[in-house]
């Protein structure tokens, strides 16, 4: 499946949130 546009603020927010959660679990 094609990746959604990188300019999508909701996508960026989700990626940032997921990244933050992953780092918090380390």
Curated annotation (Swiss-Prot):
Cell location: Secreted
Top-rank taxon, per record: Eukaryota
GO cellular component: extracellular region; extracellular space
MF GO annotations: cytokine activity; hormone activity
Alphabetized SUPFAM superfamilies for the sequence: 4-helical cytokines
GO BP term, example: positive regulation of megakaryocyte differentiation
Role, per record: Lineage-specific cytokine affecting the proliferation and maturation of megakaryocytes from their committed progenitor cells. It acts at a late stage of megakaryocyte development. It may be the major physiological regulator of circulating platelets.
Comment text on domains: Two-domain structure with an erythropoietin-like N-terminal and a Ser/Pro/Thr-rich C-terminal.
Protein name per Swiss-Prot or TrEMBL: Thrombopoietin
Organism of provenance: Sus scrofa (Pig)
